[in-house]
Amino acid sequence: MRSWILIPAENDKAIAAAAGSGAGAIVIDLARPLAPGLQAAARMAASAWLRAHREQVVAERRFERWARIPGLDTVDWREALGAAMEGSPHGIVLANCRGAEDIRQLASVLYEVEDRLGLAANITRIIPQLGSRPVDALAIGRLADDLHPRVSGLTWDAIGLARAIGARRLRGPGGRWSDPLAHVRAQVVLIAHARGIDAIEHPFRDVQDADTGRRVAETARADGFTGMVAVHPAQVPWIDSAFAPLESELSEAFRIVAAFRADPDAPFLVVGDRRVERSELQRARRLLGED
């Protein structure tokens, strides 16, 4: 999935236009801090949108429907999750995820909700948003050995971490991420590839600066990310373009898939002149649209 667009649940205009954004995944955002009355209305709007587009998505396969909920240290995350699950989303993005225990707790609640709603067990995926606070950033590495099977991707929170550490900038000279943020970002990419799941880049929020946005997306792809979050439909085309596979990448993916098809039980194979692990097989299948 190349483009993931984040849609504020309280923004009626944005929700109405979401289906036409062209993004591969539409994420209805229920994690934004709002007044209680607005929060309740946002949940209703999110639930209604997810329900309304459920059959359309199943029939046409145009986009996936996701919801972003507040962290499990908030008082209203269960209400947000309940509203989202009424529409049977493809998955949940967990904001301010503190680590593996948060993921396990969310997975356990999802199992109960799926059973109550008559959904297939474990059908709802999870993408944790990591590194919002210093202590959370330091715990990211543990996910390499303790990742729940529901987790299909990882993303991160540059702005949240920058605020938490009192950083005065997100990027340094040349547009490079400042060192603490780059550390978190690198862990997200490495763990995602180690586990054969998606690595999703933090959004570029200056909607008016398309040229810089394109460069940011191209850099993210060059650094190993598989997709990126958009905050406006205008960003979707250049995200999709930046993350489109090259002919050489498609050719290599075909060779990897063919090699493992011929020897499906092998833990690794030599393809061309290099050793290929099974985690690369998963990535090759995703690249070819087989996953």
Question: How would you describe each model-predicted region?
Answer:
Residues 1-291:
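Expand to "…catalyze enediolate/carbanion chemistry for C-C bond making/breaking, isomerization
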